Amino acid sequence: MAFTEIKHPLIIDKLTRMRKTETSSKDFRENLSEIAQLMVYEIFRDLKLESVDIETPVSKTTGYTINQPVVLVPILRAGIGMLDGIQKLIPTARIAHIGLYRDEETLETHQYFAKTTKDIDKSYVIVVDPMLATGGSACKAIDIVKQWGAKEIKFVCLVAVEPGIKRLQEQHPDVEIYAASKDEKLNEKGYIVPGLGDAGDRIFGTK
């Protein structure tokens, strides 16, 4: 499926602020949430609608409302930072959780937690994580949501690189990928360059 880089001056400006080493955890979190919110317009453009009869102050007419449940699936812990921005525009979205960690030596992905929600098989499922680096965590998370029965899945991140994009497309060709930026490369430690650093540490102030 397609890879979409969502380019917009507001997103580019906020992402630049996040990249700076001197940016505080507070500002990092706020900009992350705001970028996630700005990306919602593009990510949800194919959300299903149903017609409804309504009455305005001047006449009766037909309107349209969302007719598809939405489930957000943050990859813990950094994915949590993207929830607030998305939920501001999709307040009825339910939240499932997947906890993964990456072995710093082997770069292999390991699961430590997973909690689904009802009717995920009928829902529009968005897996979120700020970084798409090697693709290990994204692929593992999507493996899990497919085991839960999810069929309509998108992966949303802030920053992605070609190795992660390619791996996700190869393992899950039915999943659309959205990013605010396609960065240059991975370094020898598997970190995105220029990237954001460790997003989880910067969100929670644990660096």
Swiss-Prot record:
Alphabetically ordered keywords of this record: Allosteric enzyme, Glycosyltransferase, GTP-binding, Magnesium, Nucleotide-binding, Transferase
Catalytic activity: UMP + diphosphate = 5-phospho-alpha-D-ribose 1-diphosphate + uracil
GO BP field: UMP salvage; uracil salvage
Residues that bind uracil: I192, G197, D198, A199
Top EC class, one word: transferase
CC cofactor note: Binds 1 Mg(2+) ion per subunit. The magnesium is bound as Mg-PRPP.
Necessary cofactors: Mg(2+)
Listed EC numbers: 2.4.2.9
Regulation: Allosterically activated by GTP.
Gene Ontology terms, MF aspect: GTP binding; magnesium ion binding; uracil phosphoribosyltransferase activity
Pathway of action: Pyrimidine metabolism; UMP biosynthesis via salvage pathway; UMP from uracil: step 1/1
HAMAP family: Upp_B
Family under the similarity heading: Belongs to the UPRTase family.
Protein name per Swiss-Prot or TrEMBL: Uracil phosphoribosyltransferase
Organism expressing this protein natively: Mycoplasma capricolum subsp. capricolum (strain California kid / ATCC 27343 / NCTC 10154)
